[in-house]
Amino acid sequence: MKANTKFIRTEILAGISSFLKATFYIIIVNPAILSEAGMPFSAVVTSTVLVCSFGSIMMGIYAKNPFIIALGMGLNAFFTYTAVLGLGLSYETALGAVFWAGILFLILSILKVRDKIVQSIPHALRYAIAAGIGLFISFIGLQNAGLIVDNPVTLVSLGSLKDPICLTFLIGLGCTAILISRNVKGAMIIGILLTTALAWPIGRWWGDASIVNFGVPTLVNYTGIFAMPDFSLFLKANLFGSIQYAFLPVVFVFAFTDLFDSLSTFVGLAEASGYKDEDGNPRNLKKSLLADAITTIFSGLVGTSSGTVYIESAVGIREGGKTGLTAITAGILFLPFLFFSPLLSIVPSIASSIALVLVGSFMMKPLTKINWSMPDEAIPVFFTMILMPLTYSITTGIIIGFLSWTLLKFFSGKKEDINPALLIINLLSLLYLWL
């Protein structure tokens, strides 16, 4: 009896750790990003909480793994800055694309073809895509904070360090980076709260116009703490409009990014924790991927970008989490925040920008696995990474990366590195660029 009690206590504490130290910040950051696409902040808070709770609980009950599902950083940036603001899709159409990406992900998982797809994509390009998305969201964070501004001559330049927004951002970024460097638990959420506290007097001194949170109540004039959940985004997805030919690349990128992000995360967590089956694969991988895919479908229906498994789940694993009870605990802890959208709305956009910049920096880690001494790999990797922020499009970076990889491998006499699946992807990429 004592052993069982200790086991349950350990699992619950691991779930609490995963929530507070690693994933809580997404409740603040995701609504801030998606509200830029014209979506109501309070409604995105509701959708974010429901997806995180639903996905994590499903992962715990169905897949029996201690992995947390939350809204993917990078996927939410692609949703807002590429699909809606870049390509001009309505957010309803973009939500439809999220839904169909989840359906595609689900089919690939059921038919067991996901392994063949993954094997067809060169490892170097997988790493480049992750790093490129990191550069992209970091660039967005720097723009939102006013550190990078438009320039008619050089396209971009450094913003004014005398600007209160930029100054507050730099102080908050520095404090958060120091906390992370010193391995302070919950450093990200502490940094966001510190920045919010600092922005309060600055917002008072310089007025509301200086600290703006994209159309929601500012630090100076907020409306309260509690409110009933806002379900106005439920079933708003344009399911049929999102499968027009012109929008199919958006569906592909959502599915592609979610698939590889999930697989790499599952593999990484399995390696770190030792949770593997007899074949050396991540424990209950198929069920975990199905839970991830169903959560993505659910995301599109309730009104937010794709949910995905979080590598930060390692926090709970380090605390002793071994079973689905850890994920279930974290999922339950999200639910009370359904009623806190007014309180969450007082967090300024510069605090969310700190999370974008730092999470983007974390996504550079896979670049250490690339053989930079081989030009036929290094050049496509560079193109993939650099074109995402410079063209403001994750899709463009992926497409140019695939095309340049195939071209250089072919003319380098390494045709064995070009497989049929890669050729099909290249053909589709050319059609997209041509049409």
Task: Describe the role of every protein-language-model region.
Residues 34, 60, 64, 113-114, ...:
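Transmembrane helix-loop junctions in multipass membrane proteins, especially transporters and channels
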Residues 3-31, 51-52, 72-81, 85-133, ...:
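Helix-loop-helix junctions within the multi-pass membrane cores of secondary transporters/permeases
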Residues 37-57:
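Loop-to-helix transition at the N-terminal end of transmembrane alpha-helices
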Residues 87-201, 328-435:
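Membrane-embedded alpha-helical modules
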Residues 1-43, 156-158, 192-286, 429-431:
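Helix-loop-helix hairpins and the membrane-proximal interhelical loops
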Residues 51-73:
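Juxtamembrane transmembrane-helix boundary signature
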Residues 2-11, 36, 40-44, 69, ...:
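Membrane-helix interfacial "entry" motifs
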